């Protein structure tokens, strides 16, 4: 009977193992991890129905926004956003408004976290629903929000942010136009900062194969 004795290189088996990461796999976020707060300011233009006679630049008014949200994965997040100040209606009169909406964000660059620990750029289209309050006439219509947000990470806790967003609601939001028919729009361009709270970042999943092999050798 011929017996084969497996050969192990002892020095090789006892060497510290360098981690090998699974391609495209990150660990899920904890409940307290990857929260964020965003503060931004810029300008907005109201494009209502009826439109009125002014061009786009004549409709611009200052605006600001404040958002709180969380990233659940490197690609998927959600936020609650508040914005407001004033807009020019179809007669070019100033009206006060407040807008709150919940958005789903999709970071199209999130896949990079599966290949490296730190990613500086985020590009996230978003869409959501909310409510507009016209403080001048009391209207509170349902809204659809949408846009795209870009971020550049300055440090672990702070990112610079630029956002182009839009809102669509019913034509009579400003007191003019037909009720129960979509046709009033708000377009905004804002810039500001995002502050990252809690545990920040994502852990890449480690391939355990080499650790299992070493453990089996030690047991044998």
What residue ranges belong to the model's regions?
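Predominantly the C-terminal beta-signal and adjacent terminal strand-loop region
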Residues: 90-92, 97, 155-220
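Outer-membrane beta-barrel translocator domains and adjoining extracellular loop/strand segments
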Residues: 49-55, 59, 90-95, 116-117, ...
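Residues that define the transmembrane beta-barrel architecture of outer-membrane proteins
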Residues: 33, 58-64, 96-100, 119-121, ...
